[in-house]
Every structure is written in C-alpha cells, then in structure tokens.
Amino acid sequence: CAFCGLCYNGSMIKIFHTNRMTRQPFFQALINYLHEHQDVTLRQIKAAFEGEKNLDRQLDAYIEAGYIHRKNRRYQNAFRLLDSLDGLSLDQEIFVDTESALFDQLKEVTFRRQMTNATNDLIIEEDVDLMRENLTLDSYFYKMRTQEELSEDQKKLYAILGDVNPDYALKYMTSFLLKFTRKDKVIQRRSDIFVQALVTLDFLEEISPQTYALTMEMDPEQLIFRKI
C-alpha cells in the first residue's frame, strides 16, 4: 500500500465494520501512526504522510466525525479501543488492538440471525460471526450492501450470484427450500444458480446427479430452516 513504510511490527489498530471514511487507507494509516506516537503536531503528520493530497481537509473531516481529537495543536485518536466483549452487537464499528487478548476472542463471537423474505413465510437461520468473515448468506448480503471486502469463502458465492438483489435471490432460494417440507429428495434437472448457491452455502448437498437433499435443520411447522 501507499503507507507500507509506516507499518509497524508491534500492535496495530484493526477496524471492523468500517464506513466509507474509516475504510480509507490514509485514515487507517493515520490512526496507527497516532497510536504509536504521542503529542503529534500537524508538521509531524505532514512529514510522515508526505505527498498525501488534501491532508488538511481530510484531517478536519476526521476531527468533525469524532475520530481524531485536536487540542493545543496536538493530535490524538479520539475513539475508544475495545476493552470488553460485553454488550457487543453485530455490525457495530469496532476498533481493537491486534496485540490485545480480545482480538483473538472476537473471532469466536457469533450471533444467531434470522432472514425473512417477501415471497413466503420461510425463515433462514444462521450463526453469523461478528467479523462477518465466514460464509453465511446474511453476511454475504451485508457485504454487498456495505461494499466491504469479501472473504475468500464469500468470493465463491459471489462467483455464482454476483451483486444480486437479495429479495430476488431469496424468492427463488426459499421457494426451492420449501420443497423439502414435502419430500426428502428434490430433483432439479436444469442448471440453476440459486440451487448452486444453496449447495455452496451448505444448505443442500447433491446426493446424485440433479438430486438434492437438505443439510439444514428444519422446523416444518414454523418453517425455520437452520444451518447446522
């Protein structure tokens, strides 16, 4: 990256669930620079990021947004680093020190999510990791909406669905899943991207050519299909 010379071997700040501002490479390099240095002046920032265009304007925007604090012509980070897992919610913006014990613990935090649709009463239920790196349908649609970078597993689903409209995709995916309320095996003779997506998500498995079985837990009365 343009700021590789400013990367550090020690602790760094990692941001989860970035917005358009906090996703910027300069923003991420700047907060790590301020994390490593104390009593930083504007002159020091300009020397460290020589050649960065509109630096003053960007800095003012970060201050106005509440991410950077300026006092007595000195600059420091104004956000709070994560110090507890208590009260975490899915998709909240998180700043965490990569050397913190919490950084590894975050990888184990999951939330049970239910996804409804406008076509029928079927509900898809998944355990979604806080980092949204695992392959779940909920996280895939989330990243399509926020334009966050896909994980390698999620890219496999993108190769099938692309930036599909969630309502459109759910219409066909749930309609196919509903067939399993009536039978254990479903035959699909024509190639179908939504069936391919269900297999990629481990909602289904192809037990023989063009024949599929459900790999989810199903509550036929409440129409809840839970990924195992």
PLM regions with names:
Residues 49-64, 184-201:
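Short amphipathic alpha-helical interaction segments
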Residues 2-5:
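Short hydrophobic alpha-helical segments enriched in small aliphatic residues
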Residues 63-74, 195-211:
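A short, conserved structural fragment
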Residues 199-202, 208-210, 215-228:
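Charge-dense, extended regions
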Residues 81-115, 218-228:
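Short, amphipathic alpha-helical interaction segments positioned at domain boundaries
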Residues 23-43, 98-189:
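Short amphipathic alpha-helical interface segments
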Residues 12-102:
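Polyanion-binding and phosphate-handling cores
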